[in-house]
Design a protein with these regions (language model features):
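A short beta-loop-alpha structural element at the N-terminal edge
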Residues: 9-25
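Conserved GNAT-fold acetyl-CoA-binding loop/helix
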Residues: 17, 25-49
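A short helix-loop-beta-strand connector motif used in the catalytic cores of GNAT acetyltransferases and
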Residues: 49-61, 88
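Conserved beta-strand in the GNAT
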Residues: 61, 67-76, 88, 93
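A short, polar/charged loop-to-alpha-helix boundary motif
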Residues: 79-85
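Conserved acetyl-CoA-binding loop-helix of GNAT-fold acetyltransferases
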Residues: 94, 100-113, 136-140
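Residue-level recognition of the GNAT/N-acetyltransferase active site
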Residues: 95, 128, 156
Length: 159
């Protein structure tokens, strides 16, 4: 199988169910790749469309020959120390077999252009410490790593 060149990939924003639905399989693969036990709900696209409509999430999809091969999602957060908003790259994923084609760079470029257009001056994200390929990719982009442990706490209703 011949791999298409990066120029064959396009990136678009997903804003409705039709645009978001093909991304669900990528989200499942991403969670598996990161060794997560999070279950991606069957109605994932509906939830994401609601977040997009509320202005809480932006979703970018990389497409090659009509197939979704990667995605990036961005939210806006605030940094208390600097008293400034920043963009948070919640997810960046390119399907196995579609990596090393420039798709990740295209997704990051779309995110950066979007973030700059919104007037935000910083993009932050995290990746598992064991994901050396991603760390190398981010460093090649010019990003700087900052060590920190990430925690999650599943809160039961009413607690």
């Amino acid at each position: 199988m011949t791999r298409p060149p990066a120029a064959a990939a396009t990136v678009r924003r997903a804003v409705d169910a039709a645009g978001c639905a093909p991304v669900r399989d990528l989200v499942v693969a991403h969670a598996r790749h990161e060794r997560s036990d999070v279950a991606v709900p069957a109605d994932w696209a509906e939830g994401v469309v609601g977040l997009i409509a509320a202005g809480r999430l932006d979703l970018f999809v990389a497409v090659v020959d009509g197939e979704a091969v990667g995605y990036a999602s961005v939210t806006t957060d605030v940094a208390t120390w600097s008293a400034a908003p920043y963009a948070h790259l919640d997810c960046l994923f390119v399907a196995q077999g579609r990596r090393d084609l420039g798709v990740g760079r295209l997704l990051v470029r779309a995110v950066v252009d979007h973030v700059r257009a919104r007037g935000l001056g910083e993009l932050q994200w995290q990746t598992p410490a064991w994901n050396e390929d991603a760390i190398r990719f981010y460093r090649r982009l010019g990003a700087q790593g900052r060590r920190k442990e990430r925690f999650t706490w599943a809160l039961a209703p009413g607690r």
